[in-house]
A protein has these predicted regions:
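Bacterial N-terminal signal peptides that target proteins for export
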Residues: 1-11
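N-terminal signal peptide c-region/cleavage motif recognized by signal peptidases
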Residues: 17-19
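Beta-sheet-dominated interaction scaffolds and their linkers
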Residues: 22-45, 142-157
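Surface-exposed binding patches on compact interaction domains or structured appendages
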Residues: 25, 43-91, 176, 182-183
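Short, solvent-exposed loop/turn segments enriched in Ser/Thr/Gly
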Residues: 35-41, 100-105, 159-161, 216
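Asparagine-centered strand-capping/turn motif at beta-strand->loop junctions
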Residues: 44-48, 163-169
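Intrinsically disordered, low-complexity Pro/Gly/Ser/Thr-rich segments with frequent PxxP/GP/PP motifs
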Residues: 69-97, 184-211
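Terminal connector regions
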Residues: 95-139, 209-238
C-alpha cells in the first residue's frame, strides 16, 4: 500500500509539472453600465504563452435566476493570440430591469487552450468572473454614500453572534475584509454583497454571545467602482 501511494504521488507531481501555462487579464474588476450609455466594454488580454479560445457570457445574480438576461455580449467566442488583446462589448436591450435601483449580473470569461504541447500536458479551462452593475438614470445618491451609510447591529441567535447590516440605498455594496472589534479583541466576519434596500446577516467567527461592549465597532472595506478597497469604521450602537 505504501509503495502504491508513492507511485500515485509521483504521478501527480509529474502531471502538474507539465501543466500548460495560460492566463488572461481583464481590464477591470467590475463593469459599471449607466442607463444613458449605449454600450460598455472591457479589455481582455492573453498573457499566456499559447493561443487560446475565449468564451464569454453574462449570467444573472440570485435576484434574476430563471429570467432572461437582458444583455448582448460580443464576441461571445473568439480566438486570442498570445500577447494580444481584444474588447468585449456589452449592450443592454433597453428593457427588463428595474428603473429605480441598481441591478447586478455576472460576466464570465473562460479561456480554452487550443492544443496540448505534449501527450502528458494537462490542459485547463480557466474561468474569470466579474460583476456587471446596471444603473438607471433615475437613481439618487452614489455608491460611495451607500457604502458609508450602512447600519450595523449585533444579533445573537442560537448560541452564535452575528452582525446584521441594513442597506437603505439603491446600490449594491460589495465587501473586502470585515472585522468585529469588541473588548479589545478582533473577530473575522464572513460578509457577502448586500443588495439595495435589503438586510444581510453575517456570522462573527469566535465571538462570545451575551453582553455587548458599548465600544464595539465594525471595521469593513467596501470595494468601490474602480475595484479599490475603502476602509470604514463604525459603531454598532449608533
Amino acid at each position: 500500500m505504501i509503495v502504491k501511494s508513492r507511485y500515485v504521488l509521483a504521478g501527480i507531481a509529474l502531471l502538474y509539472s507539465s501543466v500548460a501555462a495560460a492566463g488572461i487579464t481583464l481590464g477591470g474588476t467590475r463593469i459599471i453600465y449607466p442607463q444613458k450609455s449605449k454600450e460598455t466594454s472591457i479589455l481582455v488580454k492573453n498573457d499566456g504563452n499559447q493561443d487560446i479560445m475565449i468564451q464569454s457570457w453574462i449570467e444573472p445574480d440570485v435576484a434574476f435566476k430563471g429570467k432572461d438576461v437582458p444583455f448582448a455580449l460580443t464576441p461571445a467566442l473568439s480566438r486570442l493570440a498570445t500577447g494580444k488583446q481584444q474588447t468585449l462589448r456589452v449592450f443592454y436591450y433597453g428593457q427588463g430591469l428595474p428603473g429605480d435601483k441598481e441591478s447586478v449580473f455576472w460576466l464570465n470569461v473562460q479561456e480554452i487552450p487550443q492544443k496540448a504541447e505534449g501527450d502528458n500536458t494537462l490542459q485547463l479551462a480557466i474561468r474569470q468572473r466579474i460583476k456587471v452593475f446596471y444603473r438607471p438614470d433615475a437613481m439618487t445618491g452614489s455608491s460611495a454614500e451607500a457604502a458609508s451609510g450602512l447600519k450595523w447591529r449585533v444579533q445573537d441567535e442560537s448560541g452564535k453572534r452575528y452582525l446584521r447590516v441594513t442597506n437603505d440605498s439603491l446600490y449594491h455594496v460589495s465587501f473586502g475584509t470585515t472585522q468585529y472589534k469588541s473588548d479589545g479583541k478582533t473577530y473575522p466576519v464572513d460578509t457577502e454583497m448586500v443588495s439595495p434596500l435589503s438586510t444581510g446577516k453575517f456570522p462573527v467567527k469566535g465571538a462570545p454571545v451575551g453582553s455587548i461592549d458599548k465600544r464595539s465597532v465594525v471595521e469593513y472595506y467596501n470595494i468601490n467602482d474602480y475595484g479599490a478597497p475603502i476602509k470604514h469604521t463604525v459603531s454598532v450602537f449608533e
